Regions:
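PRPP-associated nucleotide enzymes
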Residues: 1-219
């Protein structure tokens, strides 16, 4: 494998050993992220990689073993089956993945965004007292369409963000939030909304042959 020399001046050290937890419904994306991280960190050349501050920097995988088993009553619990003490923990969740199912009283139920969010809270609570920093990566922001109140309505998105930070989450990363001003609910914590317009256009041009972008062919 080709080695790439890191020529930047490294003036900071990692917050902690990197750990990635991909919840059910986000496993495939988590595996792709893990593959990229392993490849990128293996190819990097830096004199600091073997120092104590960089312990655990280069590993064969950064994915941590976790699961959310359910009792016969339908209730669940979050379990992290590896140590996360001092880790820089990233939790990935796709709240809009409706393909995941579970059995309750003999009936098969599909997981709703509420179910995925509850699983996120379970895993967050399992690692909040041990991990040095917790970052949630949520491609679709949970309840982002309910970001403001127009009458006697619940502010679900703001409540969800406040719940997460109260449980120990330090940063939340999402993509194209419906209204980025919802971060006002947690002004003292990290909230990043990435605009994916460039990736959408690049994906269309790459997979849709003959696509012409001009005033005659586009709205």
């Amino acid at each position: 494998m080709t080695k790439r020399e890191e020529k930047r001046n490294l003036e900071s050290i990692p917050v902690g050993s990197l750990g990635v937890i991909a919840l059910e419904g986000c496993k495939t994306l988590g595996e792709k992220v893990d593959y990229y991280l392993v490849k990128w960190r293996t190819e990097r050349e830096s004199e600091h990689k073997d120092s104590l501050a960089f312990a655990g920097y280069q590993r064969s995988s950064y994915l941590l073993d976790s699961k959310v088993p359910r009792f016969g009553s339908g209730e669940a619990k979050g379990m992290i089956k590896e140590s996360v003490r001092g880790d820089d923990l990233f939790i990935m969740v796709d709240v809009c993945n409706y393909s995941i199912t579970y059995t309750l009283c003999g009936h098969v139920n599909r997981m709703s965004p509420d179910d995925h969010y509850q699983n996120l809270k379970r895993i967050s609570s399992a690692g909040c007292c041990k991990a040095r920093r917790i970052t949630v990566i949520m491609p679709f922001l949970y309840e982002s369409r309910q970001h403001k109140r127009t009458s006697r309505e619940s502010l679900d998105c703001a409540i969800a963000l406040q719940e997460l930070v109260k449980m120990g989450v330090d940063n939340i990363i999402t993509f194209d939030a419906h209204d980025a001003r919802v971060q006002n609910a947690i002004p003292l914590h990290g909230f990043e909304t990435v605009q994916p317009a460039y990736q959408f256009i690049k994906g269309l041009l790459r997979h849709k042959k003959g696509l012409t972008i001009d005033s005659d062919h586009m709205m």
